[in-house]
Amino acid sequence: MVTEEDVRRLALTLPGTTEKSMYGTPAFYVRGKWFARIREEGDVLVLPVPAEEEKAGLIAAEPAKFFTTPHYDGHAIVLARFGAVDAEEMGELLTEAWRLRAPKRLAAEFDARA
């Protein structure tokens, strides 16, 4: 199980990441584009995914971890429960979301160092 502090630590290790408030909750940005936001409940993370099909697949495969709400219908955005995701998986989710929003050059530099 990860905590808000774990999410913050993992997100802020990604290049160019800053933390700002979005809708009154912590959110993480890369070069001005958000890639993760902690929901008001404090134990759910909002993340973009590559496509709505991937969102549907995550929810169908692991509904204890991933879900959505009507607000996100029609959007390639999934919600992840902190309590159902370990730190390694959360790091992977954040990195994938970061890659979706990061400038291509920054992502390429990151991948070259990995």
For each feature predicted by the language model, list its residue ranges:
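Charge-dense, helix-prone N-terminal extensions
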Residues: 1-114
